[in-house]
Amino acid sequence: MANDYHEPASEMTKKQREIVRAINSLKEEIEAVDWYYQRVAVTDDKELKEIMWHNAEEEIEHAMMTLEWLRRNQEGWDEQMRTYLFCEGNILEAEEKSKEEDEEEDKKDKKKKSK
């Protein structure tokens, strides 16, 4: 087994090691998608192209399941996913829009509390 740690694993909790495991799995799934994508891009055989694209889609599914696990289990993922995934318009402007929406919600909450 390769050493996936940059810090001593013995100093990490079980949960922290599970998060490292998930992140490494996610990296492997994304790498597999990349490899299949490249193979699909260069093959001339239609049937082989379809098979490899099917394989790539399976790897994408695995990556998404791992992302969902990370969202549920490591702080930070949920907020970032809510900001950037499925947003409309310019992706770079999504953060600013999210901040504005948060400020509006904070104002509403303050009004409710003051009543």
Language model segments and positions:
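Iron-associated oxidoreductase/ferritin-like identity signal
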Residues: M1-K115
